[in-house]
UniProtKB/Swiss-Prot annotation:
Name of this protein: Putative diflavin flavoprotein A 2
Cofactor: Fe cation
Co-factor binding details: Binds 2 iron ions per subunit.
Gene that produces this protein: dfa2
Gene3D superfamilies registered for this protein in UniProt: 3.40.50.360, Electron Transport, Fmn-binding Protein, Chain A (2.30.110.10), Ribonuclease Z/Hydroxyacylglutathione hydrolase-like (3.60.15.10)
E.C. numbers: 1.-.-.-
Residue span(s) of domain Flavodoxin-like: 262-404
Protein family (similarity comment): In the N-terminal section; belongs to the zinc metallo-hydrolase group 3 family. In the C-terminal section; belongs to the flavodoxin reductase family.
Length: 578
């Protein structure tokens, strides 16, 4: 998190002959929306192409309008500006566009066909418009021209990517960016950007990976290949082009490989419902669920129908317009009610100005049809607040966990032998809370049970139910060498009054000679099970958290057994944990 509090400014630099970047910078969190959650500040990047017929790309939003236009006029007479290219249109950017048009009414606006509809609705029919097409370059005079790639996604249905073939620059808008503010123009320290880039992708693109992959395919066909990616936010991508491009491929593939998929249907009149949808999508993604965002205003009906059948659950969001849901949402809801399975989990959310009838109507129709809701319906009046977005993420996590549990319950029942093992494991897990345990593991290169490492632990808790999981606190030096992610161990749960308790309390780690005096048998992993323990669990380390002089280990329980049917679990009575 940034602690720097410099005032907002506009950084200007030349990134290629005749191409300037104007980076409107803020070191504070620009908005409360989830995508800015890492609180690293951000830049809003605009680009000026100095040609016989100059073109300006993507002016920033309203909070930068004044300082941006002041800086822009130091580099061009606005009366000479010929084209204003908009990679996407939103209400925030429109505020700056309107001021520009007042100062330079001769400007021709360049956008996608969908963007033109928005512009005419917001500004009027009198606009000078040029609709970008993939097969038609925009001539800037001399040997300068720009090409275009359609980049429509559910979140930005009017998306447009601009290509400068002469300088080999791709003006990638929302692709390849990061919400990071700094003095570095380029990504020289690109390794330090990994987490910010991944978070940016998760928030903006994880729910629309199908469309992102299609755009990546078109970018891969560019000849010659790009020298720079010039995104809307963060550093210009120069030193990690191939790496970041492959990261986007990998992140898209990772979403497609998730076992559970949710279709997120929504329409948004003023952007508020879309903000809620984005927060829900991010929460689902963080919970390990594949999300397919469906903007009902732009998605073909056949595509909606296919998603209803292929998804494990669905969530539908709507504004309220004149006391009703928009026609596009009615269409999606109609498909769900007519073709959806009532065994699938559902969810409802929306924004409204006065009464919110559309949200109530959707909820009631789904309940009447026999659907189960995965979270309490979310109703937000006017513009969502930070608290509202937090509620969206909590609801999304609830939905994801309920969906996974529902999916698990519908799998084929195991054989009687497997059922018996599940029952034994459950009985053993029930003994874990607050107990004294001995953790044993067989180090690499060791083959005999008496060579195992063992340690007494008391900070043990059940952390998850499906799959069963536990957390264990271990000393740093022990965890760093013997409990890495993927390692397996046995947690031997001790019985109250057992001599094992005293024996292990006297020595935090047993040597080979001491283990040799105990009754042992081998678990599947090779680690020893103490035959005099009350129960045991065989576990695999799934994740770790550094907590200073200790590590907190989360492990999934693979098997276990109650070794003694009577007796109480040994409890640590002193206040400090081992």
């Amino acid at each position: 998190m940034l602690t720097e509090t410099r005032p907002r400014d506009v950084q200007v630099a030349e990134i290629a002959p005749g191409v300037l970047v104007l980076r409107s910078r803020t070191w504070d969190r620009l908005k409360f929306e989830v995508e800015y959650g890492r609180q690293q500040g951000t830049t809003s990047n605009s680009y000026l192409i100095q040609a016989p017929q100059p073109a300006l790309l993507d002016p920033p939003g309203e909070s930068f309008t004044q300082i941006y236009l002041q800086e822009l006029q130091r580099h061009i007479d606005l009366n000479q500006l010929r084209y204003l290219i908009l990679s996407h249109v939103n209400s925030n950017r429109l505020a700056t566009v309107k001021v520009l048009l007042e100062k330079a009414p001769q400007i021709t606006l360049v956008c996608s066909k969908a963007g033109a509809v928005t512009l005419r609705s917001a500004i009027g029919e009198q606009l000078h418009l040029w609709i970008a097409r993939a097969d038609t370059p925009l001539e800037l005079g001399g040997d300068r021209q720009l090409m275009f790639i359609a980049a429509a996604t559910p979140r930005w249905p009017d998306g447009l990517i601009t290509v400068d073939p002469q300088n080999q620059i791709v003006f990638s808008d929302k692709l390849f960016g990061a919400h990071v503010c700094g003095d570095s123009l380029y990504d020289e320290q690109w390794k330090k950007l990994d987490e910010d880039r991944a978070y940016y992708f998760e928030c903006l693109h994880a729910a629309q990976t199908r469309q992102v992959e299609s755009i990546l395919d078109r970018l891969a066909e560019l000849t010659p290949p790009p020298r720079l990616y010039a995104p809307a936010h963060g550093p210009i991508v120069k030193f990690s082009r191939s790496r970041l491009f492959q990261d986007y491929r990998d992140w898209c593939q990772a979403q497609a490989e998730q076992e559970t998929k949710v279709a997120l249907f929504y329409a948004s009149a003023y952007g508020n419902t879309a903000i809620l949808a984005n927060a829900i999508a991010q929460g689902l993604t963080a919970a390990g669920v594949q999300v397919e965002a469906v903007n009902c205003e732009t998605t073909p009906p056949a595509e909606m129908q296919a998603l209803i059948h292929s998804s494990d659950g669905f969530i539908i969001g709507s504004p309220t317009l004149g006391g009703h849901m928009p026609t596009q949402v009615q269409t999606a809801l109609g498909f769900i009610l007519a073709e959806g399975s009532q065994t699938k989990l559902a969810g409802v959310f929306g924004s409204y100005g006065w009464s919110g009838e559309a949200i109530d109507d959707i909820e009631q129709k789904l309940l009447d049809a026999g659907y189960t809701l995965g979270f309490e319906t979310l109703r937000v009046k006017f513009t969502p607040t930070a608290t509202d977005l937090e509620k969206c993420q909590i609801a999304a996590n609830e939905f994801a966990q309920a969906l996974k549990k529902l999916r698990k319950s519908r799998t084929v029942r195991p054989s009687s032998l497997a059922e018996a093992q599940v029952d034994r494991t459950e009985q053993a897990v029930n003994r874990v809370v607050g107990s004294l345990c001995v953790l044993t593991t067989l180090p690499e290169g060791c083959f005999h049970l008496t060579q195992a490492a063992a340690i007494l632990v008391s900070s043990v808790s059940q952390a998850s139910f499906n799959p069963p999981g536990i957390t264990v606190s271990l000393p740093q030096e022990w965890a760093e060498s013997l409990c890495l992610v993927g390692d397996r161990f046995v947690l031997n749960i001790l019985k109250e009054g057992s001599p094992l308790v005293r024996q292990f309390q006297q020595a935090q780690r047993l040597g080979e000679q001491q283990l040799a005096t105990l009754g042992l048998k081998s678990a599947e992993s090779g680690a020893p099970i103490l035959l005099d323990a009350l129960a045991y669990l065989e576990c695999t380390v799934e994740s770790r958290m550094n907590c200073g002089n200790h590590w907190l280990i989360y492990a999934v329980v693979e098997s276990g057994e109650l070794l003694q049917t009577s007796g109480l679990t040994a409890i640590q009575h002193r206040k400090t944990s081992s």
